[in-house]
Amino acid sequence: MRRVPLIAGNWKMNLDHLQSIAVVQKLAWTLKDAGHDFGAVEVAVFPPFTDLRSVQTLVAADKLPIAFGGQDVSEHDSGAYTGEIAASFLAALEARYVIIGHSERRTLHNETDEQVAAKTAQAVKNGISPIVCVGETAEDLEKHGASAVPVAQLRAALAGIDSAADFVVAYEPVWAIGSGQAATPEQAEQVAAALRAVIAEALGDEVAAKTRILYGGSVKSGNIAGFMRETNVDGALVGGASLDVAEFAAIIRYQKHVI
């Protein structure tokens, strides 16, 4: 089964709404000028929540073939949860995706596997495709190997959804994020294959075959092609490099470097 690659840019807590508009416009122009085929490689951006309405308006008005989504979502429908964002709010903004379980959420906000599962279920219930992030720390890697922790995290996240759900998995080794030291393509492939096996076990072979698995962690234009040659790697979740339009566009256009 052919899986359309997805290159997603997580802007984290960077860019205000005016800056986000400028970056999306410049990215769209750059890719259009380069003749990018959006049907061959999907593009998505994840601005801060305060920027989403501006990005939605721009994408709709200019009919830009760029998807967008939230960086996190609440595990609750609504209520007295100060500062949280309901999945229904993201759906009202026509967000296609939402990032769930990013290592920064797990580490800085002590997010548990149970919360990740609840957030994943909320996204699916509201028609949003969750990008479920999993990954091991350097200590985990040394103690348990590369795939043990990501496999356990994904297994927990899938507990709240069924085979009809549309979701994406992002493998982000914590030791690689923002470090400049990426995993090797072979390491990413090993873990991605293990994650696909977990999906097959939980939801069946058909779901596993169609689910996209991304790699994230110090992705740049100079190494993306190596990851994309691997059988089970279907794209990338890009952090800091996605803030540089020229660099992000070069990552998106990785196919010209793949032989």
From Swiss-Prot:
SUPFAM superfamilies xref list: Triosephosphate isomerase (TIM)
Pfam families assigned to the protein according to its UniProt record, in alphabetical order: TIM
Binding sites annotated in the UniProt record for substrate: N10, W11, K12, G178, S218, G239, G240
Any single Gene Ontology cellular-component annotation: cytosol
Catalytic residues (positions): H102 (electrophile), E172 (proton acceptor)
CDD domains: TIM
Entry's Gene Ontology BP terms: gluconeogenesis; glyceraldehyde-3-phosphate biosynthetic process; glycerol catabolic process; glycolytic process
InterPro entries named in the record: Aldolase_TIM, TIM_sf, TrioseP_Isoase_bac/euk, Triosephosphate_isomerase, Triosephosphate_isomerase_AS
EC number: 5.3.1.1
Keyword Zinc tagged: no
Pathway(s) this gene product operates in, as recorded in its UniProt entry: Carbohydrate biosynthesis; gluconeogenesis; Carbohydrate degradation; glycolysis; D-glyceraldehyde 3-phosphate from glycerone phosphate: step 1/1
PROSITE patterns for the chain: TIM_1, TIM_2
Principal localisation: cytoplasm
Keyword S-adenosyl-L-methionine attached: no
Record field: catalytic activity: D-glyceraldehyde 3-phosphate = dihydroxyacetone phosphate
Domain of life assignment: Bacteria
NCBIfam families (UniProt xref): tim (TIGR00419)
HAMAP family per UniProt: TIM_B (MF_00147_B)
Full protein name: Triosephosphate isomerase
Organism this protein belongs to: Leifsonia xyli subsp. xyli (strain CTCB07)
